[in-house]
């Protein structure tokens, strides 16, 4: 509905928050839904920026107590690597794109931007970061996606927990790997270094 109305009234300043690899993780429901919106934007000829963020670093706020209390990093993210991104960086890029489109004297064409962090991290990498931050050993117990789903069912609908499990299984087989030049492009766009997982962990522990 929103895209049809945008087309009818001639809105030229559209920034859509999709997800990295939306065109590849097609068995993951919320990825497939976002890719459907991307296709609509493209096929309708809308001038938009499509932002494709990787795994949100701030997702891990929810497992701080598990890390500090049990000495494990429980998210089944595997060993391919995820280019985890800070949501503040996402918000800043979105704002910059809206401003760029607002200030342009001519309509700006469709473009896609992968939003990634400075590091592509495995489960072992993240456990090591927590070990350094806390000064106590933190281990990565492995890739139990079924157990991950069962745990999520305690506080979200079953269908959503299943969706999350499917996503985590794709983490294990493909990861979330940035394209060549993504990190440099974002660093140039923001005019500063990208926020890292270590920055997040330090801040969370000191809060």
Segments (PLM) and residue ranges:
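Oxidoreductase cofactor-interface core, primarily capturing Rossmann-like NAD(P)-dependent enzymes
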Residues: 4-13, 19-139, 143, 150-151, ...
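Short secondary-structure boundary segments
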Residues: 18-19, 179
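A hydrophobic C-terminal alpha-helical subdomain
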Residues: 107-108, 146-207
